[in-house]
Curated annotation (Swiss-Prot):
InterPro entries: ITPase-like_fam, Maf-like. GO terms for biological process: nucleotide metabolic process. This is dTTP/UTP pyrophosphatase. GO terms for cellular component: cytoplasm. Transmembrane segments: none annotated. The lineage of its organism: Bacteria, Bacillati, Bacillota, Clostridia, Eubacteriales. The keyword Cell wall biogenesis/degradation does not apply.
């Protein structure tokens, strides 16, 4: 069995990966996301970020044998504009106000790197999410929980913001941060059967 390494500090990703893998390591990536600027193609962008994270972690590994590194990046897009993590509460408010009553997309890029052979595969998942109309008070109350500040698009579907979601079309786990079905098929492609 190959040693699986998750290149992420995200507790949500770690929890999701534990659902399908009993044994894996966590090595946090120090990849500088600003070194991969957005150039108008969201799927390519999230896959490039995921690959950058996986490659960054692969350089930290001493034992090069039998290691697969999983990199992942998730972002929210609205009107073809990327919404990352909010800079401050004002930014979070503006993001949630824009998403209110509208449909947006959540993209996750995945990369799996075989450290020994340097073989890498990348893919992405897109999920459409529709928010109900939110009041300013609802948005402010949610932001004051602190839950919005470390999440793309300023919300976490698995938490209190779940009540904002009118409907979802696609992979729920993608919106949480790790599309398990796509990850499973990619791991199988790399010779790992769960």
């Amino acid at each position: 069995m190959k040693n699986i390494i998750l290149a992420s500090a995200s507790e949500r990703r770690q929890e999701l990966l534990k659902r399908i893998l009993e044994d894996f390591q966590i090595i946090v990536s120090d990849f500088d996301e600003s070194s991969a600027p957005f150039k108008d193609n969201i799927p390519s962008y999230v896959m490039n970020l995921a690959e950058g994270k996986a490659r960054s972690v692969s350089k930290k590994i001493m034992d090069q044998d039998s290691n697969l590194v999983i990199g992942c990046d998730t972002l929210v897009a609205f009107n073809n504009k990327v919404l990352g993590k909010p800079k401050d509460k004002k930014d979070a408010f503006e993001m949630l106000q824009a998403l209110s009553g509208n449909e947006h997309e959540v993209y996750s890029g995945l990369a799996i790197l075989d450290v020994k052979s340097n073989k890498i595969i990348t893919d992405f998942v897109c999920t459409k999410v529709k928010f109900s109309k939110l009041t300013s008070l609802q948005i402010e109350k949610y932001i004051n929980t602190g839950d919005s500040m470390d999440k793309a698009g300023a919300y976490g579907i698995q938490g209190k913001a779940g009540v904002f979601v009118e409907n979802i079309n696609g992979c729920y786990y993608n919106v949480v941060g790790l599309p398990l079905n796509k990850l499973n098929s990619m791991l199988m492609e790399m010779g790992v059967n769960l």
